[in-house]
């Protein structure tokens, strides 16, 4: 079971399009990227999530061209679900990945 943030982020990145379809449902696929307004799932096109790794960078990373914000899919889960505590973010990521939840 993944215990640390980087392992969860890697597992989410392998499922980047499914993560985007679930948590960023107001967006859409555009080639190798998922575009949406922002990490809170606002409609628009200023945020891009890289769906697969490429010479430009690893899959699962995103940048919002309007604000300069960037991050990984754990940040998407945090923002789109309105979560504050990392433990809750990790539990939601594990739920999405169908992994056992962490101990409190």
Where are the regions that the model predicts?
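N-terminal structured subdomain of primase-like DNA metabolism proteins
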Residues: 1-104
């Amino acid at each position: 079971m993944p215990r640390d943030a980087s392992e969860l982020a890697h597992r989410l990145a392998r499922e980047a399009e499914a993560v985007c379809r679930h948590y960023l449902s107001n967006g859409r696929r555009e080639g190798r990227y998922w575009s949406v307004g922002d990490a809170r799932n606002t409609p628009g096109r200023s945020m891009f999530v890289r769906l697969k790794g490429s010479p430009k960078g690893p899959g699962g990373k995103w940048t919002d061209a309007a604000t300069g914000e960037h991050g990984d899919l754990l940040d998407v889960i945090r923002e789109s679900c309105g979560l504050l505590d990392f433990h809750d973010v990790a539990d939601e990521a594990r739920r999405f990945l169908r992994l056992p939840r962490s101990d409190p």
